[in-house]
């Protein structure tokens, strides 16, 4: 497991950063409500996400979908009940990366006897956790690369600058359902 102080320190810093980012994401969305343009599953973000409930909850059967859900989520996808199709212009890459968090939200939702429809507040919060996780992962990987070439101080300054002076904070905390933060983590790896 963790056999030296450097690894333990890195582990603690990573957990603290992840906890901070999750807190900031939850706090940012605490008063935004659901099914509006400020929510985690609205418009493009819902279009990326729709693969998950379609696959794991509804089995691509549109007859079980709540009425007007596509409109309530900002038209990020379209439910065509006449032809039994869910239409989205986005690929499934973001949904694949959100899958572990979706499954966790589904288990929590069913356990707490909430609606397991894929769009209740627990699923919205899962998107915040996913964004925070991939922000932390990307920063960790870039930090590890920098530590190989530079000293710890420079690596820390660069990673803090990335969060504070680029759009990473915005996409990792505010717009957690957009593809940007997931792409960042993948490029960092």
Residue locations for each model-derived region?
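Transmembrane alpha-helices of multi-pass, membrane-embedded glycan-processing enzymes
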Residues: 90-94, 98-105, 125-141, 162-166, ...
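Membrane-water interface at transmembrane helix exits
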Residues: 102, 106, 143-147, 174
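Membrane-interface helix caps and helix-loop-helix hairpins in membrane proteins
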Residues: 170-177
């Amino acid at each position: 497991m963790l056999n030296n102080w450097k690894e333990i320190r890195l582990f603690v810093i990573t957990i603290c950063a992840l906890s901070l980012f999750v807190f900031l994401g939850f706090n940012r969305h605490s008063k935004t409500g659901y099914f509006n343009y400020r929510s985690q599953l609205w418009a493009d973000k819902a279009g990326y996400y729709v693969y998950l409930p379609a696959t794991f909850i509804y089995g691509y059967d549109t007859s079980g979908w709540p009425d007007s859900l596509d409109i309530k989520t900002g038209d990020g996808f379209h439910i065509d009940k006449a032809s039994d199709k869910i239409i989205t212009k986005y690929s499934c890459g973001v949904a694949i990366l959100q899958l572990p968090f979706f499954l966790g939200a589904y288990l929590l939702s069913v356990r707490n006897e909430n609606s397991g429809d894929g769009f209740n507040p627990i699923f919205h919060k899962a998107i915040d956790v996913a964004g925070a996780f991939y922000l932390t992962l990307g920063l960790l990987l870039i930090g590890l690369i920098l530590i190989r070439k530079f000293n710890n101080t420079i690596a820390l300054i660069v990673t803090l600058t990335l969060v504070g002076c680029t759009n990473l904070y915005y996409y990792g905390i505010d717009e957690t359902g957009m593809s940007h933060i997931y792409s960042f983590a993948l490029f960092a790896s």
